[in-house]
Amino acid sequence: TITAGDLTVTAGNIDVVAGTLDVQDGGAITQVTNKGNGVSLSTYSGQITTTNAALAAGVEVTFIVTNTLVAINDVVIVNVQSGGTPGEYMAAVTTVANGSFHITLTNLSGSSASDAVILNFVVIKGAAS
């Protein structure tokens, strides 16, 4: 048990045989006005609620998430938690940069959709060395 400080492994692996890997530095933000507006949330995990502005059938929209904890070599994962009917929306991280990442949200349905979509994300720190 580590109650304070860091754990550094210089060789070998860290294996989670049973249990979960929890990222508990989280936050939440709600987008305003339209689904193309950026948001700012500097946490390693979080929840973004989009506006309920209409998104036409088959259309995608990209918005920026400003996050001071993100670096260019990090991996950011996003998924749709809820909003609309299952399978109606798809979310993907399309760009990662120092201090931000972009999420592209696509309406996969055959009609316009006006849902407040809830997206969950997590940042995994990476390196290029």
Q: Which residue stretches match the model-derived regions?
A:
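Extracellular receptor-binding modules and their adjoining Ser/Thr/Gly/Asp/Asn-rich linkers
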Residues: 14-74, 81-84, 95-129
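Register-specific beta-strand positions within repetitive beta-rich fiber domains
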Residues: 1-19
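Short, surface-exposed beta-strand/strand-loop-strand elements in extracellular ectodomains
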Residues: 87-93
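Short linear functional motifs in flexible/disordered or boundary regions
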Residues: 77-78, 88
